[in-house]
Amino acid sequence: MTTETTGAVSAAVSGQDTLQKFIFDNAAVRGQFIDVSHTWQEVVSRHAYPTAVKKVLGEMVAAAALLSANLKFNGSIIMQIHGDGPVRLMVVECDSDLRLRATAKLDPDATIPDVATVPQLLNATGKGRFIIIYSTAHYPPIAPATCRVRQPWDWRLSCLRRCR
């Protein structure tokens, strides 16, 4: 998406997706409208998700795009829900250029009704987790090990001393 600014309103466009920012001059109010229909159709065309899963995943896509649009960073926002219901995992990633991707992993044996709620989908036994990862482009995802292993039994101790 690219951003164009005109006065108190700016818009971002990617294909047919739009992000519209607005500010009221006489009030301390600002906001955004987002339409990610084009990207969303791409996501759901690749998987046969149940209606309830599409709804929650769509809300996550919109939330990730809005969050990324409001932060000034070079990297990506990753939103993950690890569920203990019929939906095991939902992941949405939006980078600083507002490029999106999303997926869900479902329990293959579960039957999901069209009107299932978020707790029914993702938090059936109270062990669901929601995680937001703020990843900058310049931070390496894995730090290289700088310690040497002399003996099989002392590698942990050696790494603890030298890699702190």
Stretch-by-stretch model annotation:
Residues 2-20:
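N-terminal low-complexity or simple alpha-helical regulatory segments
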Residues 14-135:
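N-terminal functional module of multi-domain proteins
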Residues 115-164:
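Intrinsically disordered, low-complexity regions enriched in acidic/Ser/Thr/Pro/Gln residues
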